[in-house]
C-alpha cells in the first residue's frame, strides 16, 4: 500500500490522470477556449501602441474608427470563450467527482468488516463527499488558472520582447526566484491540506454521532459534552484554515515585491539614452502595462499551488483507501443451494488488532435441518461464531466446513447466498416496507410472496395500518417503526430469502412477550428443514433446540439438550436459575 509521503505531487497526478483521461475532449476544448481568452486580453493591450502613436498622435486618424469595432469583437470573443471554458471544466470536474465517488463506494463495499470496525462512519462519509469533491474542484480550478494565466504570461512576454527586448529581458530573472518561492510553500500547503481533511472527518464524525444519538444526548444531558466536542474539532478546522490562509498570504507579497523590484529596474533602464532612442510613447506604455498586467497571473499562479496541493492531498487520502486490501474472495466453488451441514474444526479466531483470541479451539457440528443454540454471557463469543459462518472474518487456525468443503473454497457471493441473518441490530433502509423485505431482490419476488413473508412474520397487522401499507417509506433505519416492528420486518426478510442456513442473533430481543410468542411460532415453522444457529439471552426461546452449546470466554464449556444441561447443574443451569429465579 502506498504511503502518502512516498507519493510526490507529480506521481499523484499521474495516478489520477487515468480517471481524467476519458474526458480529455472537454479539457482540450476548455484549454483552447482559455488560450483564446488570454490571447484576447493580450491583444487588447497591444492596441495601446497604435492608439497612442497613430490615433492620438494624429498620424493615422482611421485607427480611431476601426479600434472600437475591434474592442467590441474582442469582448464578444472573451465572453464566449469564458463561457465555453467554464462549462467544459465543470463538465469534466463533475465526471471526475462521480467517477471517484463510484470507485470509492464500490471499493468500500468490497472491504472486510474489520475495515469498518476501525473507521468511523463520519470519516468515511467525508472521504466520499468532501475529499472527492476537493480532488476535482481543486484540480479543475488549478487547471483553469494554469492554462489561462500561463497563456497570458507567455502572450505578454512575446509582446514585450517584440516591442522592446532590452527591457523585457530583465524579467527573465524573475523566473528562478518565483520558482524558489513556490517550492518553499508547496510542502507547507500539502501538510496543512492533509490536516484539514483529517479534521473535516472529525467534524463529520462529531456531527453524525450527535444526530444519530440525539435521544441519548437529551436523556443523559450530554448537550454540553457534545457541544464542547464539536467546538473543539470546529476550532481545529478553523486553525488549519488560518494556517492555509497565512501560508498563501505570505507568498502573495513576496511575489509582488519581486515583481515591483523588476518594474522599478525597468523604469530606471528605460531612462538610458541607448534605450530611449528606440522607444515611442505607445511602446513604453505597452511594455510597462504588460509588466503590470503580469502581476495578476503571477499572483494567481502562486495561489494555484495551494489549490492544487489541496486537491493532491485529498487525492492521496483517497488512494490510501483504494489501495486497502479488499475481502479475499479466492474461492471457485459455486453452489445453488447447500444441504446445510456446518462444522467447526479446531477453530481459533482473534479480532484484527487484538492480542487475545475471541474463540479458542472451537469444535461444533450443526447437522443439516437441525437447530443449535448458543448460550452464554455477553462477550463470551456467541455472535463471533455466527459471523465466521458468513466469513465476515477469516479464522486464524482450523477450518469451517459447509457440506464438507472449507468455506474458503466457495465464492463469497455463493456462500452468503446460503445464509439468512436476523440480528439484534436490525438495519433497515430509507425505502418502502416492501423493498426492505425484498432487499436486493425486489425483481425476484412477487407482491404476493412479499405479503406472505410479512404475514408469517406477524408484520401485516401494523403494515396495514400505515398510510400506504407495504409502499410506505419507513425513514432512515426504520425510524418511523418501533423496535419490535423493525425486528419483524427483518424476520420477514429472512423468511422471504428462504436460505438453507438461518442465523438468529437475538432475533426476538426487541419484541414484547405477546409478539415474541406469536413470532416464535413463525420462527419454528421457518426453522423446519433448515440448519439454524440461534443466539439468545432468553433461554425460553431455545428450549426446543436440538442442541444447546454454552460458550464462556471464547471456549465451549457445555453442550447438550435443555433437560440434559439442567440435570448437569453446570453453567447453563446457573443461567437458567438466574433468569427464572428457580
UniProtKB/Swiss-Prot annotation:
Annotated GO molecular function terms are:
ABC-type oligopeptide transporter activity; ATP binding; ATP hydrolysis activity; ATPase-coupled lipid transmembrane transporter activity
Topology in the lipid bilayer: Multi-pass membrane protein
CDD domains noted in UniProt? ABC_6TM_MsbA_like (cd18552), ABCC_MsbA (cd03251)
Keyword Cytoplasm set for record: no
* Domain text: In MsbA the ATP-binding domain (NBD) and the transmembrane domain (TMD) are fused.
Query: Assembly state and interactors?
Result: Homodimer.
Family indicated by similarity: Belongs to the ABC transporter superfamily. Lipid exporter (TC 3.A.1.106) family.
Q: What is this protein called?
A: ATP-dependent lipid A-core flippase
Species name for this entry? Shigella flexneri
Lineage runs: Bacteria, Pseudomonadati, Pseudomonadota, Gammaproteobacteria, Enterobacterales
Amino acid at each position: 500500500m502506498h504511503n502518502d509521503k512516498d507519493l510526490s505531487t507529480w506521481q499523484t497526478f499521474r495516478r489520477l490522470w487515468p480517471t481524467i483521461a476519458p474526458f480529455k475532449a472537454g479539457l482540450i476544448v476548455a484549454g483552447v477556449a482559455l488560450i483564446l481568452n488570454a490571447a484576447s486580453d493580450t491583444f487588447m493591450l497591444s492596441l495601446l501602441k497604435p492608439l497612442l502613436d497613430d490615433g492620438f498622435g494624429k498620424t493615422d486618424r482611421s485607427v480611431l474608427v476601426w479600434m472600437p469595432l475591434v474592442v467590441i469583437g474582442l469582448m464578444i470573443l472573451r465572453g464566449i470563450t469564458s463561457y465555453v471554458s467554464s462549462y467544459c471544466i465543470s463538465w469534466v470536474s463533475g465526471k471526475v467527482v462521480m467517477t471517484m465517488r463510484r470507485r470509492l463506494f464500490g471499493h468500500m463495499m468490497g472491504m472486510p468488516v474489520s475495515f469498518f470496525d476501525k473507521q468511523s462512519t463520519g470519516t468515511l462519509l467525508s472521504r466520499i463527499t468532501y475529499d472527492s469533491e476537493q480532488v476535482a474542484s481543486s484540480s479543475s480550478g488549478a487547471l483553469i488558472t494554469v492554462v489561462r494565466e500561463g497563456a497570458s504570461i507567455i502572450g505578454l512576454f512575446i509582446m514585450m520582447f517584440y516591442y522592446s527586448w532590452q527591457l523585457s529581458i530583465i524579467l527573465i530573472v524573475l523566473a528562478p526566484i518565483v520558482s524558489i518561492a513556490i517550492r518553499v510553500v508547496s510542502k507547507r500547503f500539502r501538510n496543512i491540506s492533509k490536516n484539514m481533511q483529517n479534521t473535516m472527518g472529525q467534524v463529520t464524525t462529531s456531527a453524525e454521532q450527535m444526530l444519530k444519538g440525539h435521544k441519548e444526548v437529551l436523556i443523559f444531558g450530554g448537550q454540553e459534552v457534545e457541544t464542547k466536542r464539536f467546538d473543539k474539532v470546529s476550532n481545529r478546522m478553523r486553525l488549519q484554515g488560518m494556517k492555509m490562509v497565512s501560508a498563501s498570504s505570505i507568498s502573495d507579497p513576496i511575489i509582488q515585491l519581486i515583481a515591483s523590484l523588476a518594474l522599478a529596474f525597468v523604469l530606471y533602464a528605460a531612462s538610458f539614452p541607448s534605450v530611449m532612442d528606440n522607444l515611442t510613447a505607445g511602446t513604453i506604455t505597452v511594455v510597462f502595462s504588460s509588466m503590470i498586467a503580469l502581476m495578476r497571473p503571477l499572483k494567481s499562479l502562486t495561489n494555484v499551488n495551494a489549490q492544487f496541493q489541496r486537491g493532491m492531498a485529498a487525492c492521496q487520502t483517497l488512494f490510501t483507501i483504494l489501495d486497502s486490501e479488499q475481502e479475499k474472495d479466492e474461492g471457485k466453488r459455486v453452489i445453488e443451494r447447500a444441504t446445510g451441514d456446518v462444522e467447526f474444526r479446531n477453530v481459533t479466531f482473534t479480532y484484527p488488532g487484538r492480542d487475545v483470541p475471541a474463540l479458542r479451539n472451537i469444535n461444533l457440528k450443526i447437522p443439516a435441518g437441525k437447530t443449535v443454540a448458543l448460550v452464554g454471557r455477553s462477550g463470551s463469543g456467541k455472535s463471533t461464531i455466527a459471523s465466521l459462518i458468513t466469513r465476515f472474518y477469516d479464522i486464524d487456525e482450523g477450518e469451517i466446513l459447509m457440506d464438507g468443503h472449507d468455506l474458503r473454497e466457495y465464492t463469497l457471493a455463493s456462500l452468503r447466498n446460503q445464509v439468512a441473518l436476523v440480528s439484534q441490530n436490525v438495519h433497515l433502509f430509507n425505502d418502502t416496507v416492501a423493498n426492505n423485505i425484498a432487499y436486493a431482490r425486489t425483481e425476484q419476488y412477487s407482491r404476493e410472496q412479499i405479503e406472505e413473508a410479512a404475514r408469517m412474520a406477524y408484520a401485516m397487522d401494523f403494515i396495514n395500518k400505515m398510510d400506504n401499507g407495504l409502499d410506505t417509506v419507513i425513514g432512515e433505519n426504520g425510524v418511523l417503526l418501533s423496535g419490535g416492528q423493525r425486528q419483524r420486518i427483518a424476520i420477514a426478510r429472512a423468511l422471504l430469502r428462504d436460505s438453507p442456513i438461518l442465523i438468529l442473533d437475538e432475533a426476538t430481543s426487541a419484541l414484547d412477550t405477546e409478539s415474541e410468542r406469536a413470532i416464535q411460532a413463525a420462527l419454528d415453522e421457518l426453522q423446519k428443514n433448515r440448519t439454524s444457529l440461534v443466539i439468545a439471552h432468553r433461554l425460553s426461546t431455545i428450549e426446543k433446540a436440538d442442541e444447546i452449546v454454552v460458550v464462556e470466554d471464547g471456549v465451549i464449556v457445555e453442550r447438550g439438550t435443555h433437560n440434559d444441561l439442567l440435570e448437569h447443574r453446570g453453567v447453563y443451569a446457573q443461567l437458567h436459575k438466574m433468569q427464572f429465579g428457580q
